[in-house]
Amino acid sequence: MRAVANWFTPKIALARIAWLRTILYLFVILDMHAFVRDTRLKGESPGLYQPLYLARLFELPTPTVAITTTLYYVLIVACLVAATNRFPRIAGWVVAPAFTWWVLIGMSDGKVDHDHLALVIALWVLPTVAQSRKGSPWADQTRSEAAGWAIRCVQICVIATYFLSAIAKLRSAGWALTWPGSAILTWAIVRRPHPVGEWLLHHPWMLHVMQWIGIIGEFLSPVVLWLKGRWQLLGALFFIGFHVANTAILLIHFLPTVVCWLAFAPMERIVPWFRSRRSADSADSAGDAGDAREAEDQTEDGRQAKEQAGA
């Protein structure tokens, strides 16, 4: 049991949490304007509102212009504060329920985008980690089990996005493995025409290969959680490449999930790396200056020796 507990709560530097806070809270602002951007419009048509399960469970009120406008400005202010790593718990506990409500309203037309799973969970677990107390939060190398638990939750949700997608593909086909051999990508390209996708329509075998690679990758995605070092990096790059291909073929980006892949990245090394580079550059500059002074001294000594010889 202790090994299981240790896996769920690895000791991770607080600096990774600080970087993740800054990036994700700023991304939420982008998300509100680029992806789930019609929440405020839903407040103008309350009669068309169809609450999702969580909204019904918590008996959230029907959105109005006043509610969605308040949500908007509260989220903007709280995200900007949280991104600075000042008052991360207070600001974080404001952002988590506010953005969850924002998403519930925005997706109330029935299209629930599963690419927001990891992002929403990340916003709920980040406030559980205390504020850094040692200098710059982005450089704090203090290792914390609380930080490890938050990071692990985000990682699990990132992977669950793919694995549960594979399960959904099986379930929709009556638990038969027919999805990889279907014409789903062909249908998607026809529905979302794009030059790269249209070129692939002339090579259907490539589409079937891509479907097989995709579903196998989704089923094997949990393996990434146990990989280490470069192997984990390769696993992450595989899925990021998967999204790059989807964007090129279908213009489907999945950015809310992609940005959460940063939970796997050792971002706590960023500041020490820059500091070591700066120190190395300073040492090189000092060495160059010393060499220049030594050359000047040698030139001066040579000139004096010539003058003495001439005398």
Give names to the regions the model predicted.
Residues 1-311:
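Alpha-helical membrane-anchoring segments
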